[in-house]
């Protein structure tokens, strides 16, 4: 970026311990999590405020970041800070059970909800792309998507390979903040993986954090390693420096047959996130400033080639699926008429979980102490004693996942269990078992908090894929319930014009008041997911609503 206000050569690290720098834990928590989003161990490009996902930023510019920090340190417990696309625009009197921060990022009136108009606004300093958890201050590094990716690979193994992916291998691309979870998720599921990435710096980061095991010198070397490890039944992840739009067609040409194919490049943002075939990264970034339309066209043409290769694999009978980056849409716009012949991962593998309100529940230890996370891991096992799959996940996470920034954990649980765990964590803070408060949040990719016809709400039973009332209702309900901060975003995951979604974070500070808020929010939030899927006619969701006592007037009334 050429705007000096969007670049600062500084390293940010959230405070640790139990000493406040703000007036209460309800304002200290968003302050620390904002700073944690920009920790160099966490963010992809923190000096430009970019957390992950192409240009997903934590604040609009450095002046806005400074003012957010300053405002949070003085904010009272009966005040609410309003943040508009990464800019702090107002502080208003509310009450002690209201959110301390309300955030709206990247939202545009539908007719203007496209990258061209957004980029004009961004260039003028009038907007910011918040992705999902970048601008809502609850990104925890690649761990945040590891379990969801793991669950996807495990379910694919159940559906296609008799219950296991051992001795199988996954072909994919993208090792950014989200895609970087793929190699570790495949390894944890028991599969090998070949992970193509066009930036060596991202490969180095994933090697350093142990998300990927090793790097091949070239494609031939990668294929030799894959053949060896699958023959030995070993689950080892391999990174390959290169361009997916060049390598996938070459694999098709050679007759190489993976066992599973997906992709998690930043295809949602052709101007900033997808390197055209034959280009260097330096060419791409330079021309994005001077010839944006040509860059977008070249990137989308390469995506069309990439998707055609994925379709070729699918024709061979290889399980092939989109992992939520909107690459099928981009390819379709470039003339690949049947780009949507392979499904998205949600309708293919994840929707039954969403029907029960199960999704990416996460928490972070504001103390900075890893031991606080290990104690909460043990509490989860204690309170959910009979879920062997969940216990195995927690054991693998402790063994294999390196914390990035403040220690955190991701754990997919649903309606009923989220509130149970939240109340237990709050009690652990009250008793002193945890050395400081924890925050509980989630990805916007959850059962009731997103409308995204090419991802989370693809192929809904009743055809309501594009109805975006649901994330709005989710945000309103979480605000009414007393979440500590609530966010409403547009364009996350799949890009401008293709999604609306909401997020929430709540603080466990050990008080009675926190317990009341936790009980409300962590019941209502997944409850909206069950409601949304029950309304669409899913029997699993209807049964869950009845079992959990949800009051759905048109269904349970």
Swiss-Prot record:
Annotated organism of origin: Pseudomonas putida (Arthrobacter siderocapsulatus)
Pathway: Amino-acid degradation; L-histidine degradation into L-glutamate; N-formimidoyl-L-glutamate from L-histidine: step 2/3
Active site: 411
Name used for this protein in its record: Urocanate hydratase
Localisation per UniProt entry: Cytoplasm
UniProt binding sites for NAD(+): 53-54, 131, 177-179, 197-202, 243-244, 264-268, 274-275, 323-324, 455-456, 493
EC number: 4.2.1.49
Cofactor section: NAD(+)
GO cellular component: cytoplasm
Cross-referenced HAMAP family: HutU
Keyword NAD annotated: yes
Similarity-based family: Belongs to the urocanase family.
Keywords (A to Z) from UniProt: Cytoplasm, Histidine metabolism, Lyase, NAD
Effect on the protein upon substituting residue 64 to A: No loss of activity
GO biological process terms held by the UniProt record: L-histidine catabolic process to glutamate and formamide; L-histidine catabolic process to glutamate and formate
Effect of residue 192 to A: No loss of activity
Catalytic activity: 4-imidazolone-5-propanoate = trans-urocanate + H2O
């Amino acid at each position: 970026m050429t705007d000096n206000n969007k670049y600062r050569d500084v390293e940010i690290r959230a405070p640790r311990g139990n000493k406040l720098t703000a007036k209460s834990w309800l304002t200290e928590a968003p302050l620390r999590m904002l700073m944690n989003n920009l920790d160099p161990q966490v963010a992809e490009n923190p000096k430009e405020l970019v957390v992950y996902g192409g240009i997903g930023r934590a604040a609009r510019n450095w002046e806005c970041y400074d003012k957010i920090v300053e405002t949070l340190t003085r904010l009272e417990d009966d005040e609410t800070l309003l943040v508009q696309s990464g800019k702090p625009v107002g502080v208003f009197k509310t009450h002690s059970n209201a959110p301390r921060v309300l955030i709206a990022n990247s939202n545009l009136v539908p007719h203007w909800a496209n990258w061209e108009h957004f980029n004009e606004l961004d260039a003028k300093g009038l907007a910011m792309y918040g992705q999902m958890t970048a601008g809502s201050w609850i990104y925890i590094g690649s761990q945040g998507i590891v379990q969801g990716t793991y669950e996807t690979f495990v379910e694919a193994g159940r559906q296609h390979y008799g219950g296991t992916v051992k001795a199988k291998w996954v072909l994919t691309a993208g090792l950014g903040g989200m895609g970087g979870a793929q190699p570790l998720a495949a390894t944890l599921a028991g599969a090998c993986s070949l992970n193509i990435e066009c930036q060596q710096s991202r490969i180095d980061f994933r090697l350093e954090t142990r998300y990927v095991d090793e790097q091949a010198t070239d494609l031939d070397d990668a294929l030799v390693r894959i053949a060896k490890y699958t023959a030995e039944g070993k689950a080892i992840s391999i990174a390959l420096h290169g361009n997916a739009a060049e390598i996938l067609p070459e694999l098709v040409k050679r007759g190489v047959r993976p066992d599973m194919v997906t992709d998690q490049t930043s295809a949602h943002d052709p101007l900033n996130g997808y390197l055209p075939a034959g280009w260097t990264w330096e060419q791409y970034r330079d021309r994005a400033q001077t010839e944006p339309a040509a860059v977008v066209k070249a990137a989308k043409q390469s995506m069309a080639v990439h998707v055609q290769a994925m379709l070729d694999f699918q024709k061979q009978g290889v399980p092939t699926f989109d992992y939520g980056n909107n690459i099928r849409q981009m390819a379709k716009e470039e003339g690949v008429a049947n780009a949507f012949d392979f499904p998205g991962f949600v309708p293919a593998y994840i929707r039954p979980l969403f029907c029960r309100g199960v999704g990416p529940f996460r928490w972070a230890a504001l103390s900075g102490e890893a031991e606080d996370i290990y104690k909460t891991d043990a509490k989860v096992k204690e309170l959910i004693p009979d879920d062997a799959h969940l216990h195995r996940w927690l054991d693998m996470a402790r063994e294999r996942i390196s914390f990035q920034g403040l220690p955190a954990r991701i754990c997919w649980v649903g309606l009923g269990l989220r509130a149970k765990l939240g109340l237990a964590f709050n009690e652990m803070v009250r008793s002193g078992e945890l050395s400081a408060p924890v925050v509980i949040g989630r990805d916007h990719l959850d059962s009731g908090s997103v409308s995204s016809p090419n991802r989370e709400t693809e192929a809904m039973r009743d055809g309501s894929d594009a109805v975006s009332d649901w994330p709005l209702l989710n945000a309103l309900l979480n605000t009414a319930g007393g979440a500590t901060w609530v966010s409403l975003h547009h364009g996350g995951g799949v890009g401008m014009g293709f999604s609306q979604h909401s997020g929430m974070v709540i603080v466990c500070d050990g008080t009675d008041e926190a317990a009341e808020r936790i009980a409300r929010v962590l019941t209502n939030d997944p409850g909206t997911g069950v409601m949304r899927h029950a309304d669409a006619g899913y029997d699993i969701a209807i049964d869950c609503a009845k079992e959990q006592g949800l009051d759905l007037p048109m269904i349970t009334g």
